[in-house]
From Swiss-Prot:
Transmembrane segments: none annotated. It comes from Caldanaerobacter subterraneus subsp. tengcongensis (strain DSM 15242 / JCM 11007 / NBRC 100824 / MB4) (Thermoanaerobacter tengcongensis). SUPFAM superfamilies: DNA helicase RuvA subunit, C-terminal domain, Nucleic acid-binding proteins, RuvA domain 2-like. Residues 136-139 are annotated as: Flexible linker. It comes from the Bacteria. It is found in: Cytoplasm. Homotetramer. Forms an RuvA(8)-RuvB(12)-Holliday junction (HJ) complex. HJ DNA is sandwiched between 2 RuvA tetramers; dsDNA enters through RuvA and exits via RuvB. An RuvB hexamer assembles on each DNA strand where it exits the tetramer. Each RuvB hexamer is contacted by two RuvA subunits (via domain III) on 2 adjacent RuvB subunits; this complex drives branch migration. In the full resolvosome a probable DNA-RuvA(4)-RuvB(12)-RuvC(2) complex forms which resolves the HJ. Residues 140-187 are annotated as: Domain III. This is Holliday junction branch migration complex subunit RuvA. Residues 65-136 are annotated as: Domain II. GO terms for cellular component: cytoplasm; Holliday junction helicase complex; Holliday junction resolvase complex. GO terms for molecular function: ATP binding; four-way junction DNA binding; four-way junction helicase activity. NCBIfam families: ruvA.
Length: 187
């Protein structure tokens, strides 16, 4: 329903972030993996979102990478796994480790997440074995952006400045990403 939200970070809580979107503060629950990639308060960020509707209200869950959102949605398809359980897994288990665990049947990795016991972990593996890729592929865009981030850091920009400058860059090459980011930083 809502593909993504781009706005200014107003506040960061232990499991959520408040994004100011044209004067409206939106509370978005995020996994730890997304939390550690967020720029500081006052900077712009973009999160891919999932709107969860319950009888007593709405909750929005956000992810820095689209692959995390897709995995979150797959976890919700498993009986007995709700949004908080799926978020717990994504907070503790990196995507690459999750995919390896599902493909190898290693439920112990999944039980590291709070609220996920042996039976739930085994059910996740059983139900998602045919739904996750056989091997982990780092998205090209992420690796390009990481290289561009390193280049901006080498040029003397702070990590928060570099992340902000690269937040909405669509790139085909590292050079192109750095050029677009430098233009944004020059404004």
């Amino acid at each position: 329903m809502i593909e993504y939200i781009r706005g200014i970070i107003e506040d960061i809580g232990p499991d959520h972030v408040i994004i100011d979107l044209m004067g409206i503060g939106i509370k978005i629950f995020v996994p730890f993996s997304t939390m550690k990639e967020l720029p500081p308060k006052g900077n712009i960020t973009k999160l891919y979102t999932y709107l969860y509707v319950r009888e007593d209200g709405f909750q929005i869950f956000g992810f820095k990478r689209k692959e995390e959102l897709e995995l979150f949605e797959k976890l919700l398809s498993v009986s007995g796994v709700g949004p908080k359980g799926a978020l717990s897994i994504l907070s503790v288990v990196p995507i690459e480790s999750f995919i390896k665990a599902v493909n190898s049947g290693d439920y112990k990795i999944l039980t590291a997440a709070p609220g996920i016991g042996k039976k739930t972990a085994e059910r996740i593996i059983l139900e998602l074995k045919d739904k996750v890729p056989k091997e982990v592929v780092v998205p090209k865009e992420d690796s390009l952006l990481n290289e561009a981030l390193e280049a901006l850091l080498a040029l003397g920009y702070t990590k928060s400045e570099a992340i902000y400058a690269l937040s909405d860059v669509n790139c085909e090459s590292v050079e192109q990403a750095v050029k677009e980011a430098l233009k944004k930083l020059a404004k």
